[in-house]
Amino acid sequence: MDSIMEPYVADLLADDITASMVELLSGDGGAAQMDVGVLDAYLRAIGALPAHPAAPGADLAAAAEVESMASNDDTNGNWDTKVDAKVPSAFLPPPPGFPPLPVPALADEPVYAAPVDEGDAIRAFMQQLEWSEQYNGDDDAPAPDDSMASRPQLCAPYDDDIDANLRAMEKDAAERPSPDYLDTVHNGQISAASRASLVAWMGRLTHRYELAAGTLHRAVSYFDRFLSARALPSYTEHQLSLVGATAVYTAAKYEDQGTVFKLDAREIASYGEFASAQEVLAMEREMMAALGYRLGGPNAETFVEHFTRYSKGKEELRVQRLARHIADRSLESYGCLGYLPSVVAAAVISIARWTLNPPGALPWSSELHELTGYSSQDISSCVLTVLNTQ
């Protein structure tokens, strides 16, 4: 090892703090397994060794190595956060015993501390969300990485009419649940936590029978609208499960008429351990009447599909898939009932973009503002509600 490394490195390895740091970075094998070139680059980057003469491209290579080492720091490997947020490793805290690495300044770009818990992660995201549209409008900012800027020109002739129709339907009071029905209709006999557990159970039911995409969102909408209109004769687990299972059964038939070939009232009764298929059918009739037979209103999944319908390329399709998943999880949040489905859809797309962090992407952009009709400020409150559900 000494024949490979310069004397400066050998001297530093003799120091207790440095030796412990090498062990931390290299794993259980200690310094003997450490990549000497990587260690040498790191020590020079923090000023512990004199710098090598500059060579074309050398700074970028060294910076990449240092970033890789910093990202392996165990002190940042155990974030207790449910948001899989990626923070550039150059912004992470330094290893124990070492000074911070110099971060190249980016014009007008704020530097965020690495989140160390869920609260910090959410605050970092909200700061970036607030800043993203301002940065996107800066003449010196990089061009948006997505293709949304050209989407208005690619839209089908009827897109504007479809969008207007969806927006009108989502604002129709007859198609929306009450945002406070647990208190106003049921006098607190159903808690938000009980509702969340039941929605999760409904999700397992849709997966068990591989029901059509969109079934869960429509079923939860039916469930909330029904409970917004009717008090229950009892608030037992059996009664609530009957309402939830019937909502899934009704929504599944709306989404795909072929559902009747793999799922019927007898199967629902068996899955939910209800008395009989007749109990399910009776609840279905009661639910349809309470909903006024209005079954086709848009939901958050509808708008996620609508806003991402022109997604193309690997990164955009990944954002679309994750946004759908987050939208599914948001159904468990009672607080999301206070927002229009299009706002929830915009919020989950923003969270998905930030979580996956494709190169150059920001949580929001002027193109997304134009496409959805919402600014980052418009969706910020909903974003917080969704993040606190994950």
Curated annotation (Swiss-Prot):
A GO molecular-function annotation: cyclin-dependent protein serine/threonine kinase regulator activity
InterPro entries per record: Cyclin, Cyclin-like_dom, Cyclin-like_sf, Cyclin_C-dom, Cyclin_N, Cyclins_cyclin-box
Domain of life assignment: Eukaryota
Region (Disordered): 135-154
Any one GO biological process: cell division
Family the entry assigns: Belongs to the cyclin family. Cyclin F subfamily.
Protein name, UniProt field: Putative cyclin-F2-1
Source species: Oryza sativa subsp. japonica (Rice)
Gene that specifies this protein: CycF2-1
